[in-house]
Curated annotation (Swiss-Prot):
It comes from Rickettsia rickettsii (strain Sheila Smith). Nucleoside triphosphate pyrophosphatase. May have a dual role in cell division arrest and in preventing the incorporation of modified nucleotides into cellular nucleic acids. This is Nucleoside triphosphate pyrophosphatase. Its cofactor is a divalent metal cation. Pfam families: Maf (PF02545). GO terms for molecular function: nucleoside triphosphate diphosphatase activity.
C-alpha cells in the first residue's frame, strides 16, 4: 500500500499580518516566518505587474538560498497602480493622503506577484503567478479623506490603504480576487501548493481537515 507522504514545512517569506491571517484562513500554519529583506525599488520604467512578480521571486529565492533544510517557501509582493503609475507603500500621513486622493472616484489595479519555491534535496521547483484585481473607490469628500488618514491604517500598505479595514467602505466596485488585494491570492496559492505535492484540505477528502505543515 502506498503511504501518504508528509508535507514539507512551509516557510513564509513575509512578516505581513495580512498574509499570515490569509494562510490561517485556509488552515496553513507556517513552521517559520522569515521576512526577506530586499530592495523593493522599481527599476527604471518598470511596470506594476513585472515589478510585483520580480520582487516576489527575489524574496523567495533569497530565503531558499539561506536555508539548508527541505521546505516550501511562499513569497508575495503586492503593488497598487493607477494606469502605469505605481503607488508607493505609504510611510507617512502625507503619502497616505496623496494616494487616497488619487484613488478617489477612480479605478485602480492591485497586482500581487506570487512565488512559491519547493526546495528538496537541494533541488528547486518554482511556481510563479501574477494576479490582478480591479478596484474602484467612490468619490471621497475631504472629510472622508482626512478621517481615513487619521486612522493610520494606510501606513506601510500598497497604495496607502488597507482594503480589509475602513477603506472597504469606499469600494463601489471590485473585479477579481479579494484576497489578492489583501496581499495573497488564496486560489492561486492553493493551486501552486497542490502542484508541488502539498496536500490541502480544500481539494482533499473531508477527513483531512487541515493543510499541515511539518515542523
Amino acid at each position: 500500500m502506498k503511504q501518504n507522504r508528509k508535507n514539507l514545512p512551509i516557510i513564509l517569506a513575509s512578516s505581513s499580518p495580512a498574509r499570515i491571517e490569509l494562510l490561517n484562513r485556509i488552515k496553513i500554519i507556517p513552521s517559520q516566518i522569515i521576512p526577506a529583506d530586499i530592495d523593493e525599488t522599481p527599476n527604471l520604467r518598470e511596470l506594476p505587474a513585472p515589478l510585483a512578480i520580480r520582487l516576489a521571486y527575489e524574496k523567495a529565492i533569497k530565503i531558499a538560498s539561506q536555508i539548508e533544510e527541505s521546505a516550501i517557501i511562499i513569497a508575495a509582493d503586492t503593488v497598487a497602480a493607477v494606469g502605469r503609475r505605481i503607488l508607493p507603500k505609504a510611510t507617512t500621513y502625507e503619502e497616505v493622503k496623496n494616494c487616497i486622493k488619487m484613488l478617489s472616484g477612480r479605478r485602480h489595479r492591485v497586482y500581487t506577484g506570487l512565488c512559491i519555491i519547493k526546495k528538496e534535496n537541494d533541488q528547486l521547483t518554482v511556481r510563479q503567478k501574477i494576479v490582478q484585481t480591479i478596484v474602484k473607490f467612490k468619490k471621497l469628500s475631504d472629510e472622508e479623506i482626512n478621517f481615513y488618514c487619521s486612522l493610520d491604517e494606510g501606513i506601510d500598505k500598497a497604495g496607502g490603504c488597507k482594503i480589509s479595514g475602513y477603506a472597504e467602505a469606499f469600494i463601489s466596485f471590485i473585479s477579481g480576487s479579494y484576497s489578492n488585494v489583501m496581499g495573497l491570492p488564496l486560489f492561486e496559492t492553493v493551486n501552486a501548493l497542490t502542484s508541488l505535492g502539498f496536500r490541502c484540505s480544500s481539494i482533499m477528502p473531508a477527513k483531512m481537515n487541515y493543510c499541515h505543515s511539518a515542523t
